[in-house]
Amino acid sequence: MKKEASELLGFSPQKDIVYNELLPYKDKLDDESNEILAQIKGNLGRAVQLREVWPGVLFWTRKLSTYIRLYGRKFNKEDHVLFVKLLYELVTIPKLEISMMQSFARLLITLLKKKELLSREDLELPWRPLYELQDRILYSKTEHLGLNWFPSSVEAVLKVLIKSCRPYFPESATQEMLDEWKPLMCPFDVTMQKAMGYFELFLPTTLPPELHDKGFKLWFDDLISLWVSVQNLPSWEVNLVSLFARLANDNIGYIDWDPYIPKIFTRILRSLNLPVGSSQMLVSRYLTNAYDISYVVIWISALLGGPSKQAQTQLSGLFNGITSFFHPSNHGRWLMKLMKLLQRLPASVVKRLHRERYRTPTWLTPIPESHLLSEQDITDFVESIKQPVLLAMFSKTGSLDAAQALQNLALLRPELVIPPVLEKTYPAMETLIEPHQLTATLSCMIGVARSLVAGGQRFPEGPKHMLPLLMRALPGVDPNDFSKCMITFQFLATFVTLVPLVDCSSAIHSRNGLTQVEKELCSASAEFEHFVLQFVDRCFALIDTSTLEQTREEMEMEKMTHLESLVELGLSSTFSTILTQCSMEIFQVALDKVFNFATTSIFETHVAGRMVADMCRATTKCHPAEALKLFLPHCCSAILQIAANEEVLNEEELDKELMWNLQLLSEVVRVDGDQLLLYRSQLVQILQLTLHLKCKQGYSLACKLLYHILRSMSLIYPREYCSIPGGIQQHTDTYLPIQDWGRPGELWNLEIQWHVPSTEETEFVFYLLDLLLKPELQRLQKHTEGQQDISRDDVLQSLSIVHNCFLGASSLLPPLHGEPVPQLINGMVQLYETKVYTGVDYDMSRENYREDICKVIRPLLNHTLEHSEDDIKSLFSIIKIINDLLHFKGSHKNEFDTRWKSFNLIKKSMENRLHGSKQHIRALLIDRVMLQHELRNLTMEGCSYRSVHQDLINDLLRLSTSRYSQVRCRAQNVLFTALGTYNFCCRDIIPVVLKYLDPERTDVTQQQFKGALYCLLGNHSGICLANLQYWDCIALTWPALVRSGMSPSMSLEKTSIVRLFDDLADKIHRQYETISVNFSIPESCVEIAVKMLKSSSPEPNPGAASEQEELEGRKREEQKNKDAMQKYEKLVADLLDCLHDRNIPWKFEQLTIGFLSLMLRDDLPLPSSAVLFFVESLNHDSLLVRNVAISAVAGILKQLKRPHKKVAVSPYDISELKTSLQSPVVSLLTGDRPDNQWLQYDSSRLPRSQRDWDECCFIEKTHWGYSTWPRKLMLYAPLEEQPKQGQTREEMNEREQIIYDHFSDQLFIDQFIQYLSLEDRKGKDKFSPRRFCLFKGLFRNFDDAFLPLLKPHMERLVADSHESPQRCVAEIISGLIRGSKHWSYSKVEKLWALLCPLLRKALSNITIETYIDWGTCIATACESRDPRKLHWLFEMLMESPVTGEGGSFVDACRLYVLQGGLAQQEWRVPELLHRLLQYLEPKLTQVYKNVRERIGSVLTYIFMIDVDLPYTQPTTSPRIREFTERVLARLKPLTEGEEEIQNHIVEENMEGDQDERTQAIKLLKTVLKWLMTSAGRSFSSSVPEQLRLLPLLFKIAPVENDDSYDEMKTDAKTCLSLMSQGLLYSDQIPQVLSALEEISRSSSWHARYTILTYLQIMVFYNLFTFLSDAKAVCDVRALVLRLLEDEQLEVREMAATTLSGFLQCNFLSIDEPMQAHFESLSKTRLPKRKRRELGSVVDTIPSADLVRRHAGVLGLSACILSSPYDVPTWMPQILMDLSAHLNDTQPIEMTVKKTLSDFRRTHHDNWQEHKQKFTDDQLLVLTDLLVSPCYYA
């Protein structure tokens, strides 16, 4: 196959689309594709060589995309590599416009998508250009200032692009990336997220084994140990998981994951966020940063297999632990994740198995033998996931996930999964009361259908279920239950498609050597006929009940309801599938039955009639000759008989019988055209008779008949979709149909029977057109010319005939021709349309009716608009005709899209992902070939725009602005489609649309005005004319939109018009992307283009450009860039002109300002006239305008920023660093090292003089130096090399002068500050980053020039305690501090002399409304700044924050502000943190709750830096351990006492010092706040320290949930809940357990009770870490069993609950010793009861014996409750043991009753199944127990 192809083509294609080979005109395709490819290579190469990015390069890259869509990668490897390299160069052009970049990127992704086609030897791509692109866009420094507008989709496109290029990065890339990004790894900083994001995206993982040393081995140990040591799920952990999953999947067998497997599974389990225990608090970040399931499944499936089998053990453990969550009765927000896990995991394993066993080997490294999945591995996997999947079938989220999982599992092990599904399906088919069970089981059966029917050696008995399933499914065709009906149709269709319905029962006698199974199947196949007939009866019943009630309104009559149309579709497609698969004998019987049904009664034509007609159509389509013989003569004679009566033709309401026969006829002719030729005379007779009926319904049906006849004759389509080539045959001696059950189609043996129009058919089509279409066209023409007056109804009838004639025959009519419209654009590269051959050779000698219709319709439209504009129905019809004249060649785009979607759905529901290689069923493959034909038919992009299109589009525009909104709306939709089809026609149409908006014109109606605006707005999918991304276009549309505000047709009273302008503004702002002013192409691109022009096979056509042309190209490139600049400046000038017009309404002023703000860019400064306008607008009286102006001026200031010189320094040359680098080991570590100590804040070495300041080496970015130093550190050059500070006005440029003059003007500033200190939205205002940017820019660009004017304002505002003035001054101050980054020392010193008093004052005036703003102010001021530059600020903030002055609230606020500043500084201020801690420690006993909470939060930040990460030095910041020691010493009074701690402190300051105990309780409250806040924030929990506080917490935490408890108790409870969820390392487990062990001996039963709840959560959230430590499991078990015998009843009961939970998640197992232990306990003898005296007290204290007996009973009931959904082998006996205790004393009796009632509740659903597990005697006892009187007692 391949060889022939390459000889014909002249090269061997990389990978073409095979379906093209099966088209009926395949012989013409090679020449066609070669010609197109040669054009693409030639023109794309030339476009790059001539430097014409637009339109040349863009146009021809789009052509390449289309080429790939039509032919696949049908080019040789050399071309493939050249295309990739060229596009890579294009994508990475530095100044390229984003929309073009995306367009190239998408094509490059397509070219790289099949990575097996190009190996690393063929292609190498550099990584750095992509990194620079990603960095420029994702971390843009100018986007937030509005200097760059990126589309929202760009991030996703870049990600996929990098993914596609990753396999081809050079081998040195990994090391280079690590050097680049490792210095960013500072875990407290946002740069950590950046580094991890880059690692995840860029690190290559597909290097061959010999290069692993240059690949993952460089980073794996570092990153995995980092991952292992992080405990609290920071946001970047997700990136690591994704990276590890990819690494594992790409290198199966080359990495030893075993040491990490328990940790991996523990974290996966934690990440599911399942609820455990009753009082669990979830940490919110666990939800937001949870792992993405799609990575988790890749990781798991890559870990399976291999020698150790450990992953499978853990996976089984995982599913055992979570199975019960899948039970349908459980529901919560975690369910979606669980379902996704179930659905994706089998798919992922199938994918892996396909790669191991079936995929053609590629250059990618194969999996080593040792790690391939063995048969046993697969079985184990399926066994482990089977139970949850079966439970999930009935889940609340629907059965879809389970069905997909089962489909994949059935491919692996049909014998394990299909039987249990069948067990659930058969009863579901019988039940009447639970229809949802039927829907669920059927959808799962559909998934496993192919595995079931194919049988195979694993599951030979599969096919036997086929017939019973089909027969039992029939009752599902139920008119009363819509969803049941639909799923039944789907089920029947799926199964029948796989099986030829042939009765082979006689083969048993006539053939020898059949196996037992084959014999059974043969005899069963006798049922097929019965099945088909029963199905037909069911359908009849369905139709009878759905006959249309006559009560519907006339309008609704037109359409069936949505549900009805779905049922109709389901019915007709299922019926046609069944008939297609029938043998001729069965078909004949069904045909007679349908024919009788259809012809013996008369149906109304709307619902029932349509369904019956559909069934008849299906029968005729299957075997046209046999069926037409019956139907056609019958219908024709019936119609002729009734219509013989002349009066009938003019009746308004037609005879029902006539209508029904006409409807039936119009459907049954939808068959192969050649079959219809036999009946041509009858058909013509009927058409002539009925096309001119008076009744609209009548002639519509006649038109439909005509349309169907023409289509059948003129289109290319497959004749049959049977599952076996050559149709269904009877069995013979050599052939047995049974063997074809479930057989996939063979791609190279499809034998598609095509219908291709014969000469005879074409003749007949044109005969019909001449006979029927021509007279109508003449009639309409006469009407237009005024020679013959026709009524509106007749016009409509004529149009209807014209339209249907055209729709039916359009594929034979050549497209419209005409002269191309000249001068829309001028490029040097040719742009021509691609002609795609679709099997039709147009006969040019015949009349081209497409042209004729066009010539008649245009004058008719004109006539109608002038004389009868209200004839809406005719206009509708004309719009449809114009649409089809332009585009229609036999298939509609939307129908094609729907078919493509449904094809994909069916493919997914029935595909075999394990074997791959297109093993679909035959019908599906034929469908795909047909879709390929239609795709070619619809390929329209890049058509030349000709004069005839221009005329029609102008007509559409006229209709789009007509008087009636319905007409406008329809015409606009057609117009938008047309605009997207023809090259550059928008440029032609925009001026025409804008004429309607011209303010000079007085003749434009409001409707026209609105229509024109809608034309500019566009629809949601198509083009938006108002915002085409070209300077020439927006230079026209934007000013016109603004000026239209002065048009007489514009009225702001009309809400619809106001809304339109809002929508337009909104759409433009949403969609605008910065348009480039630089269209240059670099040399590197041109070199590759020249190579491409020299390549061969096929030779590029046209060839390379001459030198002359190249020079011309360069000249044009320069000119184009110049033009762009001019157009940009002109547009800004035009918009400003509009604004200076006094008459412009306010709405339009705002619109214009919005447009102007989009004109800010980072590569060109804004023209000074616009700068002046924006600066003046800062004091505009409209808030909206002021806000836009603030943003704009901030952006302008960024444009005017003079670049500060930076020098690259090797970090090790910095004087401070040199001295500290003695030991070499240190440099490998991160954290506080000698070589980064000089960066830290040290009050003894602060730059307090000019000299110190100049000598100090400032490093502003906080993360530098924490991890490794970068190779080259960029530092600011010394002051004398920087731009001059304090420029005089003369030294400034014009833009700077404008700003300088305004901000030096006292009045301007007064007004500006007054506006800023107003309230915008009451109570909703926040600190505004925009205003901060504005002030930062002012002080950065102009130093302290404006301070003198602002100073009095700041002093006034600080003194005003109202919210808005405070916020305003906070914004100014933060901008001032950040703006002073490069000021000279003297200026900075003066600044702080001014600021410190202001800030002191502000902090003493702080209020509840403003403290957050001040926090933001200080945090913003300190972000990314060297702390040594801000020492004045820190020293000022550290002056006794908690003084009590101004009350507790002010204290809390001051702390908050201080925390904001210190948190930004992270690890660089250890000294300040120590000072703060020292200062706070004595104050931890604060009385006020708000101060306590704040101190708790501050402590979290103080200790944030104390992390336990790998390769990290111990921190010099405060450490938790030392702090905990000191705190514990102060809590002594509480830890020593035994009694429970009550909070008896009244919150008020009592004089004098209270006793130690009271102080300790206050301290404890603050410590609790600290523990709570740090739970979710820090990276690692300090477990050993927390453990020492545990005993105390257990003492306080209450047992019951009660809101009336005080704060301390609830806090303790929260802390315990949060701590129990913490991630534990394996070495911490013994510590925790010994702590718990100790507390369990405490005298307080509250503590003992709480231990159990703590234990439940802790074990579940660290399940696999515990399980991998056998001693720990024993200890936990012993602890629980001991507490089961606790003297306190509540503790015993809790221990039982805990035990049952542990058993349920398989942490503990029910073994012999445990069962024996409980049984012996439960048999403890109780002392005999003596006759008690009434009221004696002795008996209330439980004796030790009673406790032991109760413990035994509790243990037994725990066992029973641990398996709520099934009955294990040990359960019946335990139930019997329990029942013996029903009459024991309390509390035993209660326990037994409760257990029995729970058992009954949980096992009730599937009792039929569960009953099997008990013996008859046991059942008797049980039934007795469960319904005996004691149950009600």
Curated annotation (Swiss-Prot):
Organism expressing this protein natively: Danio rerio (Zebrafish)
Gene Ontology CC: one annotated term: cytosol
Cell compartment(s), UniProt: Cytoplasm, Cytosol; Nucleus; Nucleus speckle
UniProt subunit comment: Homodimer. Interacts with the 20S and 26S proteasomes.
Primary residence: cytoplasm
Biological process (GO), any one: proteasomal ubiquitin-independent protein catabolic process
Region (Disordered): 1095-1122
Renumbered residue ranges of the record's region Bromodomain-like (BRDL): 1640-1728
HEAT repeat start-end pairs: 460-504, 983-1022, 1164-1202, 1344-1382, 1626-1664, 1670-1708
Superkingdom in the source lineage: Eukaryota
Protein name: Proteasome activator complex subunit 4A
UniProt comment concerning the protein's domains: The bromodomain-like (BRDL) region specifically recognizes and binds acetylated histones.
Protein family: Belongs to the BLM10 family.
Pfam family, one: HEAT_PSME4_mid
Record function comment: Associated component of the proteasome that specifically recognizes acetylated histones and promotes ATP- and ubiquitin-independent degradation of core histones during DNA damage response. Recognizes and binds acetylated histones via its bromodomain-like (BRDL) region and activates the proteasome by opening the gated channel for substrate entry. Binds to the core proteasome via its C-terminus, which occupies the same binding sites as the proteasomal ATPases, opening the closed structure of the proteasome via an active gating mechanism.
One Gene Ontology molecular-function label: lysine-acetylated histone binding
Keywords: Cytoplasm, DNA damage, DNA repair, Nucleus, Proteasome, Repeat
Comp. bias regions, Basic and acidic residues: 1111-1122
